[in-house]
A protein has these predicted regions:
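Intrinsically disordered, low-complexity terminal tails/loops enriched in metal-binding residues
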Residues: 28-157
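N-terminal secretory signal peptides that target proteins for export/translocation
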Residues: 1-13
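Intrinsically disordered, low-complexity segments enriched in polar/charged small residues
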Residues: 10, 14, 18-19, 110-112
Length: 157
């Protein structure tokens, strides 16, 4: 009778050990995947970080983030941004979309910010949230009379 009682326990014990080993293997694989993702992304030099002014990829526009308060973690924020042309004139009637994320972690922004025109080249990015500390990229796609272009801000929070 003892052997009958110990058999189910033994089988259950083996199944539990197998489950733990499988979970450990998955965790190790996930850590290796994250390490590969992090090493595949080259972090920009320190001088590439900041609020601007930055010139767009095609040299069409310049943008400067002008937060009223320092950017903060885990809070919804609104951030004004000044968009000018290469001569420093305000860009009016631009359509601006916001994207971004943490390149070293492989995820995007936790929110979907929207942009509202304020006038005189000023726009308000609303609903911006940074969920954790580290290197973030904030990407603005700007479409105005001079054409479409992109600007990427590197931020350390």
């Amino acid at each position: 009778m003892k052997s009958l009682k110990s058999t189910p326990r033994s089988t259950a014990k083996r199944a539990a050990i197998g489950f733990v080993l499988a979970a450990a293997a998955l965790a190790a694989a996930a850590c290796g995947h994250l390490a590969m993702m992090g090493s595949a992304v080259e972090r920009p030099a320190a001088e590439a970080f900041g609020l601007g002014p930055l010139v767009s990829e095609k040299q069409t526009y310049s943008a400067t983030l002008q937060p009223v308060q320092p950017l903060r973690l885990r809070r919804l924020q609104s951030v004004p941004v000044l968009i000018t042309d290469t001569q420093g004139r305000p860009v009016e009637s631009a359509v601006i979309s916001v994207d971004g994320g943490m390149p070293e972690h492989g995820h995007g922004l936790p929110t979907q910010p929207r942009v509202t025109a304020l006038g005189s080249g000023m726009y308000q990015i609303e609903g911006l949230r940074f969920s954790m500390g580290g290197w973030w990229q904030l990407k603005l796609a700007i479409d105005a009379s001079a054409g479409a272009d992109r600007i990427t801000f590197n931020l350390s929070l």
